[in-house]
Each structure stands twice: as C-alpha cells, then as structure tokens.
C-alpha cells in the first residue's frame, strides 16, 4: 500500500489519534469540493450501538443542520483506518443530504455506492456499506434481560434482550406489542456489570473511613453574642458605671425673672383689652368679617341669587367635527348637557344665598 493512501499502516504510529475536525476539513476539500462547510462533526460519548450516524434537520423548508456523530466508545478500540473509513462513510451520507436532499440515512443505493467506489479508488480506502464492529458493540452490552414466556426457547435470541444502558424492555420498544401478542411473558434481569448497584455515597464514606479521615461532619455551634458584649469598657459593664454615679442637680436656676400668676383677673383683663373686638353681623359670628358680609382680607365677589323660575336645561353643541377620529360616529351633532339645580341655601357666614352644589367652595372662599 502506497504512502499516499489515507489508511497507510505507518499512520498508526505517526498519528494514531487524529483530530476528526482536521480530517473532516481535509476530506471535504479533496472529495466533496468544500460543499460540506455547513455540516458539523463531533464525538458521541454515549453511542454504543453503531460507529457513526449522520442526521439532517430541516428548518423553514430551506435546508437545515447536518450533523455527523462518531461513537467514541467504539472507535477508540479500533485502528485508525476504521475511524477514517467511518468518517468518510458518514460524509457521503451528508453530501447526499445537502446536495440531493436524500434524507434516507440507511439508503445505500446506486448514488451512495458510486461515491463510495470513487473515494476508495482515489484514497486507497476500503469504505463499506455497513460497519462490522460487532465485538465492540457486544462488549458494551452489559445489561441482560430474559423473557419468562415461550419465546425463551425460540431462535435466534432465545428470549434475551441485551443493552448497554439499564433500560428494561417496555412499551417504548417498537416490538413490545407484537411480543405481548405472541408470547406475553415478563422480562427478568439476569446480568449487569459488577458493582453496578452500589451507590456512590456509600463508596465515598468507605474511602474516608479507610483513609482515617472523619466519616461524619460535626456541627459546631457558634458562641451566642448579646447586646451586653458591645457595652463593656475596661472589663466592666456600663450598667455598673451608671449605678455608681448619682445624678447631679443643676446649681443655678434657668429663669431668674419675677413672673406673673396665671389665671389672675388683672392680667386677663389687660390682655383682652389690648386686642380689638371683632364686629358681628345679624347673621351670626364671623372671624374678621364686617356687617356687610364682605371679608376685609379678600377682594369682594358678587354672588347672584338664582331666580325663582326653574332653570332650563343648558346644552352645549360641539357640532360636527372634521377630525378623522369622528368619521365613524353618527351624523347627529355631538352634545353634552349640563343641568343646573334650583336648590339654594343661606351662607352662615355672610348671609348670602348660594346654590347648594356651590356652598362648600363658597365657604372656603368666604372664610379664607
């Protein structure tokens, strides 16, 4: 085999663990004209049933993401040539997906075989239709179940179900309904990896006990802190210092005048006579008011009393609007009505007749 071959035995020593991304870029430029730049390639650490898989996802009807995944558990046990041929096998599927929209992953028809023979002749490889890693696949299937029904005596499986993960046979399997009709037996687990049922927590505890370390954590209670700890001075509490000293009275008086006796008749009369008396009108007492009922502090305001005749309804006609916001309304004029009340009361301050609905505002204005 020539050195130009992609699977030359010398590469097993010079490059036993190649970078799959570098190989992908090299093979894409050499055999596929760089048309697989939109694809991705990556390792799959939990794929045990097959060596490689190519998936295609359509997004929005304009193409999608093409992904190539290689089984790391299976290919790490195989020679470098198997990795190269498996990668090229999946790249042919990706090329048919991208260029011809052939989404049948298991399709190895004339188109697939044409590209397979072309690459085998150009690169000196031995790409095949199916992978033959049966020994490696069998190695990772450590969880076994066997049926208790009649199918345990039938070829070719004799009732065995072998898997790499701990997932018992059930309704999620495609063949489950057929098995229930033809056999109807129950699956019992007969084999699993050694030490699979042991928990990780007990293992860590045993390791600590063997090494002499503490097996259990001790709870340490922090010391209690009270407010008295923050008021200690020189080893003595502030309460002791405060009790040792007696309170002292002020030596001098704050007020030295003679003062006057509260409630005396002479002082009361003199204080009352020093202020002018407020005038009163016929309508009652009023602070700062005059006999005419007009405040001396505010400008005069005329309040007209309503007539004895009933007040007619006042209508404000806004008319038709030219604005576009009113185009969808009725053709009639938009009207807002205000009805006045004929109830009136007498202001207790200025004896003025004011409408009942305005009395509160009038009192604020009159007494202000």
From Swiss-Prot:
Composition skew (Basic and acidic residues), residue ranges: 226-237
Top-level lineage group: Eukaryota
Residues the record marks as active site: 90
Disruption phenotype: In normal conditions, no obvious developmental or behavioral defects are observed, except that but the brood size is smaller. Upon exposure of L1 larvae to hydroxyurea, replication stress sensitivity is observed, resulting in increased sterility.
Domain (SprT-like): residue spans on this chain: 21-190
EC number in record: 3.4.24.-
Compartment(s): Nucleus; Chromosome
PANTHER family: DNA-DEPENDENT METALLOPROTEASE SPRTN
Subunit structure: Interacts with vcp/p97 (cdc-48.1 or cdc-48.2).
Listed name of the protein: DNA-dependent metalloprotease dvc-1
Organism, as annotated: Caenorhabditis elegans
Gene name of the record: dvc-1
